[in-house]
Amino acid sequence: MEELPRALNYELSHDLHFDHYAGAAAQKILNSGRSSPEASTPTITTLDAISSSDFLKQIGQQILSSIQLKHQHQLNEVSHPRNSTSEEIMDFDLANRVILDSSSVDQLQQQLEYDKFMNEVWIGIVFTLILISMVFCICSCFLYHQFRTWKRNYRNNANGSTQCTIVDIEALKLHPDVEDPVPEYTLVSGLPSYEAALELLQKSPQSSCLIVYPSVFNVFNKQERSSQELQHPGVATSAPPAAPENHLAPQTPSFCDATMPLLPATTAAAATHAAATVTAVTAATATSATLAASPTCESIKPNFVMMPIVPSYAEVFGSSYKTVDEKKKSKSKDSQSKDDIKR
């Protein structure tokens, strides 16, 4: 009995309202227990006063309930060691107890931090999408502007080219005597046109157009002389001084002798006929006859003029094309016809 009040002072909860159960006597016992162990020992008079009330009954019930709760709590810890503190709160009588658990506060703090992080993530995603859409819109506008500019320039160039061609055609119709803008050298072959070749031929000397092959003409000259000797042996025998001169002369033929075999058939026949009619009076007359029978360079030059074989513009571009000379001729014919009509 002596140890009971001390145990009650240390083990019982301070939430019990002793003034409600035992009144002033219980309050006195509680105060005496707080002061010192010797003074806290109750006397017989106080126990008699307390026994008359329900204070002991309430204390007994409280002790039994606390023992039962402790025993049940130990069993739950053995069977379920990972249970949370929420089950312990449900087992206790919450009417007279207030239990503060820090784990719920930590969970609440973690939930708040997670929500804040997710909000920041969503804000970043939305901002990135807005930025990408703005860049895409700017690029699309720039490309569309470039396309419109290119299209406008293309239309202007096309219209300008058609207008230029129309203007050129109208100018040709109004002024047919204007010189043809086609260059002298064609774009396909690079060769001069027929008219340009004629102009170049007139400007350049005709002697430059001669073709000479000295290595071949010696053979022709020997054959020609051998045939003449066979036909006219008297001429060959009556002119002995001319033979040494021919032997002493160099083997390279002269300009006129080199071009002799390329003469046409009419010229060769005339030369042989003139050589046959020459009489063998003297060597001087024979040499003069041979010189007279041989053609001169002036007579040979027109026969060896090489003309370039190049198609004209009329053959290339069709019969509708007219050169400058043809335009002038047609213009003169038109003027003559107009004058005849007026007369």
From Swiss-Prot:
* Keyword DNA repair set for record: no
Q: Name one Pfam family in it.
A: Comm
Its main subcellular localisation, reduced to a broad class, is membrane
Q: Which GO terms describe its cellular component?
A: plasma membrane
Keywords for the protein's UniProt record, in alphabetical order: Cell membrane, Membrane, Transmembrane, Transmembrane helix
Q: Where in the cell is it found?
A: Cell membrane
Query: Which stretches are transmembrane?
Result: 123-143
Q: Which InterPro entries does the protein's record reference?
A: Commissureless
Entry similarity comment: Belongs to the commissureless family.
What is the purpose of this protein? Answer: Essential for nerve cord development. Functions downstream of fra to control axon guidance across the central nervous system (CNS) midline.
Could you tell me which residues belong to the region Disordered?
Answer: 228-253, 323-343
Motif PY-motif, chain ranges: 191-194
Keyword Transmembrane helix carried by entry? yes
Q: Which GO terms describe its biological process?
A: axon guidance
The name this protein carries in UniProt is Protein commissureless 2
| Membrane topology, record value | Single-pass membrane protein
